């Protein structure tokens, strides 16, 4: 019904992954598996809705607080995550990272600390340090059956007086960990006990395929908190901009909206972003179901090929995200030598693990959100590069 094997040429579309790969990797003639967007066209229902809106021809100022947008969000949380939300607590933002940054500014002072689980999405470091706050890392531990947080170590950090916020990535990027209900309950209890506010970035919430379902932070939340997300990852529409969140505390919500509108002048959203989200959340579930099957098969392909080439890896697909977080430490290869071989010999761009913090050394992050034909070339290039530097 949906053909994810179709190759779409993204060159010349001002595309970060393809047109600007040289910015990060130094050369343009690379096959990229980098930034976390996909090479697939978005859902047909979204394209149809956008076409209809474009035919209207008038693109004046718009407002996010409308019944259709709020109802679509409520419908999605109800049908996909079995969670009821109060539409009065929903807020808009131009991006999840903008919302993260704004709440960091509001909920902490210069020099105070923000807890993150590491390895961590690189934009988290930038949002924290760019606001003159201090990163307080808590390293996830890799075990035979997945990634885990030592809750004792987490509490030791949360208990420090300078710690004001826990910035949670749920599901976690780059490891693909899906937090269990017990883990979320423990973290909620610890944050409440130590007066730490919680910002939960749940932008990958729809990309889950393991036995553990995604559980929204709102299901366990206590105290002051915000759940931030978007349809941009799920439906491959980040260039349309637009995100949303849930802030239950009315004072915190009002303060956020005041900054969004008054100080930053960002409260009028892209009407195409609204149109796309409404179509996605009301009609896009069948497309997303098919996409998840394709992406899981892609990740399984990576596991089969990498484990056949290097049995000592025994790599298992992640619980979530289309990002293969590959632990190459058993191969004892040099990160920089591998990157050099990937770029110069294989002409492939794959994110080095140290992009996501010191705990990422020895890993690479390979974006599997692409047609299989492209993925085959990337995995072959990675295998060849590893063999060249061993």
Swiss-Prot record:
Keywords recorded for this protein, A-Z: Amino-acid biosynthesis, Lyase, Methionine biosynthesis, Pyridoxal phosphate, Repressor, Transcription, Transcription regulation
This entry's Enzyme Commission designation comes to: 4.4.1.13
So which domain of life are we looking at? Bacteria
Annotated GO MF terms: cysteine-S-conjugate beta-lyase activity; DNA-binding transcription factor binding; L-cysteine desulfhydrase activity; protein homodimerization activity; pyridoxal phosphate binding
Q: Name one GO biological process term.
A: methionine biosynthetic process
Database matches in CDD domains: AAT_like (cd00609)
> What is known about what this protein does?
Acts as a beta-cystathionase and as a repressor of the maltose regulon.
Assembly and oligomerization: Homodimer. Interacts with MalT.
Name assigned to this protein: Protein MalY
The organism that produces this protein has a lineage beginning with: Bacteria, Pseudomonadati, Pseudomonadota, Gammaproteobacteria, Enterobacterales
